[in-house]
Amino acid sequence: MTNTLAPNLPPTLVHTMRMPIRWGDMDAMGHVNNTVYFRYIEQARISWFDLVACTPDPAGEGPVIVNAHCSFLKQLKYPGEIEIRTFVGPPGRSSFEMFHQIRLVGADGNPGDLHAEGGAKVVWVNFPAEKSVPLPSAICKLLPPQKLLPGK
């Protein structure tokens, strides 16, 4: 997979999930509304955090999004099913990048063309203190190693 959103980072696939395109996801233009793509990505992100036992805890710590982006490449329409692939970049002290691909699942059950790609910078915070904290070791173990630039 070529990582067009962050070409200098080697992509590390950590999660794949499928979900239906719902009738209510569409707007007056007859296609999935642009805001819904962020919901799809959010669901994939939280599904991965649940899978690795790092579900956000409002009374403790968890991830917050400080920047999110999405490139809309092809329209999605109801009915259909999508596959969302989640990739991660190397960790910082309290943050890492997540990248997502949204593909329409074909009639043959295989994921087809790329319809959207997006991502977010995730910062781990202590919610009551409203301060960033170091990433949990459970998350760091799942992220690709940090690459040092020449001369560093």
Which residues does each PLM region occupy?
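A broad, structural micro-motif
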Residues: 32, 63-65, 115
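HotDog/MaoC-like acyl-thioester-processing domains
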Residues: 1-17, 72, 76-79, 89-152
